[in-house]
């Protein structure tokens, strides 16, 4: 689970493209806080701080407390824009999150213990179908990732959502029993198996 992190911001009295450009020239990143049936609050963040925070990882699944000139806002990032050439942040959107609220987030899928799979050690391939999945969870308990244990995985094994144990209070968001990955034999072995099956069918 990711811990609540703190950010400092200042109120941005003017909105619009011109005001946003002025903030960037001053070394700040424009942002907005919205949601919870309250008026949006336009803010700006220190460029170095928010750039480092974004590239530290798990940004969109981290709960933040933003101090805006002494007023604290509990939020989760919903989107951010990067410069298409230099990849530095241009704008960030934050969603207000009340105490005990449930949020929908996308988290990465991590495949563990590939070295403990006989099939993968013998040259098989892990065919990853889903690199990320959506979860519904308490804002205070967002998993950093979903983990799939490949220990003992053999050729033809398929890993589904239903086989993954989630933390208490966390559920899949709008999924059926989707496939996450399959273990595929090397092409030569797969071709040989297909030929054997065809010969057996003729017999």
Swiss-Prot record:
Keywords: Ribonucleoprotein, Ribosomal protein, RNA-binding, rRNA-binding. GO terms for cellular component: cytosolic large ribosomal subunit. CDD domains: Ribosomal_L25_TL5_CTC. The gene is rplY. SUPFAM superfamilies: Ribosomal protein L25-like. InterPro entries: Rbsml_bL25/Gln-tRNA_synth_N, Ribosomal_bL25/Gln-tRNA_synth, Ribosomal_bL25_b-dom, Ribosomal_bL25_C, Ribosomal_bL25_long, Ribosomal_L25_dom, Ribosomal_uL5_bac-type. The keyword Chloroplast does not apply. GO terms for biological process: translation. This is Large ribosomal subunit protein bL25. One of its GO terms (molecular function) is structural constituent of ribosome. PANTHER family: RIBOSOMAL PROTEIN L25/GLN-TRNA SYNTHETASE, ANTI-CODON-BINDING DOMAIN-CONTAINING PROTEIN, RIBOSOMAL PROTEIN L25_GLN-TRNA SYNTHETASE, ANTI-CODON-BINDING DOMAIN-CONTAINING PROTEIN. Part of the 50S ribosomal subunit; part of the 5S rRNA/L5/L18/L25 subcomplex. Contacts the 5S rRNA. Binds to the 5S rRNA independently of L5 and L18. Pfam families: Ribosomal_L25p, Ribosomal_TL5_C. Belongs to the bacterial ribosomal protein bL25 family. CTC subfamily. It comes from Xanthobacter autotrophicus (strain ATCC BAA-1158 / Py2). This is one of the proteins that binds to the 5S RNA in the ribosome where it forms part of the central protuberance.
């Amino acid at each position: 689970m990711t811990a609540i992190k703190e950010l400092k911001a200042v109120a941005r009295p003017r909105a619009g493209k011109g005001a946003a450009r002025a903030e960037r020239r001053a070394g700040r990143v424009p942002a907005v806080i919205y949601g919870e049936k309250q008026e949006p609050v336009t803010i700006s963040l220190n460029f170095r701080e928010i750039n480092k925070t974004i590239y530290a990882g798990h940004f969109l699944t981290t709960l933040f407390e933003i101090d805006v000139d002494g007023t604290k806002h509990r939020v989760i990032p919903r989107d951010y824009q990067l410069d298409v050439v230099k990849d530095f942040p241009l704008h960030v959107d934050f969603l207000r999150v009340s105490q005990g609220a449930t949020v929908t987030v996308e988290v990465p899928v991590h495949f563990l213990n590939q070295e403990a799979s006989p099939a993968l050690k013998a040259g098989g391939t892990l065919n990853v179908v889903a690199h990320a999945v959506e979860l519904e969870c308490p804002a205070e308990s967002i998993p950093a990732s979903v983990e799939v244990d490949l220990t003992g995985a053999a050729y033809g094994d398929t890993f589904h959502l239903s086989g993954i144990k989630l933390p208490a209070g966390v559920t899949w968001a709008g999924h059926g029993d989707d496939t996450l990955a399959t273990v595929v034999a090397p092409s030569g072995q797969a071709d040989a198996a297909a030929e054997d099956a065809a010969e057996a069918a003729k017999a």
